[in-house]
UniProtKB/Swiss-Prot annotation:
Keywords: Hydrolase, Plasmid. Gene3D superfamilies: alpha/beta hydrolase. Its EC number is 3.5.1.-. It comes from Rhodococcus erythropolis. This is Probable N-octanoylanthranilate hydrolase AqdA1. Involved in the degradation of the Pseudomonas aeruginosa quorum sensing signal molecules HHQ (2-heptyl-4-quinolone) and PQS (2-heptyl-3-hydroxy-4-quinolone) to anthranilic acid. Probably catalyzes the hydrolysis of N-octanoylanthranilic acid to anthranilic acid. The lineage of its organism: Bacteria, Bacillati, Actinomycetota, Actinomycetes, Mycobacteriales. It is an enzyme of class 3 (hydrolase). Belongs to the AB hydrolase superfamily. It comes from the Bacteria. It catalyses: N-octanoylanthranilate + H2O = anthranilate + octanoate + H(+). PANTHER family: AB HYDROLASE SUPERFAMILY PROTEIN C4A8.06C, KYNURENINE FORMAMIDASE.
Length: 302
């Protein structure tokens, strides 16, 4: 089922990652092609509604996937990555396949992108998505009191802003933050700390997973340990706040793999995320810290 209205269509040909595949270790061009094929299979398998509008901008859309007989189910709100400048829910709908099969309602959310909009607009949209889900997800068999927010890369940043700050009044039970830049000051996008979630923690869900590759190569020439350090930074900030969490380190996983691992039953990330989403484990286990992160910290001047 598809909602009516003027919505942004998925076209990876406009993406930098698609236009410059040789610049990347990760195979983003191949990922986008495979993702739409997998999405078609998910659409055949599960009840779904596409291009639901939660705002007036063409970017403000979300897709919902679920098993047909789902009732009072846990809910996953998933924010895609793309450096806040590219991406579309359609390229991540296939992640719903595993989660809907296990009984969750999967919401794949879009949001306004740079440079036409600001990162602050992206964050505001993440809050708006969450509010929409709370008000409407029961009609899709979801339980609004069992929401986990999840996201990869810039989507992980958005998920963290929703789950860890009290700017969003919605109660969140879980967070799965994957390979996210959390200190925007280091990226030159924002001079303030207001959009850096590790500096803005004012609440923490009951169950939290932070994951990242070690190392995690993406664009050639970039620091393959940057996201490793950022992930460990968020984990350390949560511990300092007094939170319990699971840290999942994915050795030698590129930036595509750290995204797809979320729905891969063979990945340790899937098992940790399953416990967050379904609440099927109350044991909090923190994985060993990345040795690379410790080395980098020791090399930094005071």
């Amino acid at each position: 089922m598809t909602a009516n209205g003027d919505v942004r269509q998925p076209d990876a040909r406009t993406y930098f990652t698609h236009q410059h595949p040789a610049d990347y270790h990760a195979d983003w061009k191949g990922y986008y092609e495979r993702a739409l094929v997998s999405r078609a299979r998910s659409m055949e398998r599960f009840a779904h509604e596409l291009d639901i509008r939660y705002g007036t901008d063409p970017h403000q859309i979300l897709n919902v996937f679920r098993a047909a007989d789902t009732r009072s189910a846990p809910v996953i709100i998933y924010f895609h990555g793309g450096r806040w400048r590219e991406g579309h829910p359609a390229f991540y709908d296939h992640l719903a396949d595993t989660w809907a099969a296990d009984g969750a309602v999967f919401v794949s959310a879009g949001y306004r992108l740079t440079p036409e909009h600001s990162i602050a607009d992206s964050v505001a949209d993440a809050w708006a998505v969450t509010d929409w889900v709370v008000r409407n997800i029961a009609a899709y068999g979801g339980d609004p009191s069992r929401i986990t927010v999840a996201g990869h890369s810039s989507g992980g940043h958005l998920a963290s802003m929703v789950a860890l700050t009290d700017n969003c009044a919605v109660s969140i039970v879980g967070l799965v933050c994957m390979s996210a830049p959390v200190d925007l000051r280091t990226l030159g996008f924002w001079d303030d700390d207001t959009l850096s979630p590790h500096l803005q923690i004012s609440r923490v869900p009951r169950r939290v997973v932070v994951s990242f590759g070690d190392p995690e190569p993406n664009r050639k020439g970039d620091d393959a340990l940057r996201l490793t350090r950022e992930g460990q930074m968020l984990a350390d900030s949560l511990v300092a706040y007094g939170a319990s969490l699971r840290t999942v380190v994915l050795p030698n996983a590129d930036h595509v793999r750290t995204a797809t691992a979320f729905a891969d039953r063979q990945s340790p990330l899937f098992g940790a995320a399953h416990s967050v989403i379904f609440g099927d484990s109350t044991e909090d286990r923190s994985a060993p810290r990345s040795p690379h992160f410790q080395e980098e910290k020791q090399s930094c001047p005071e």
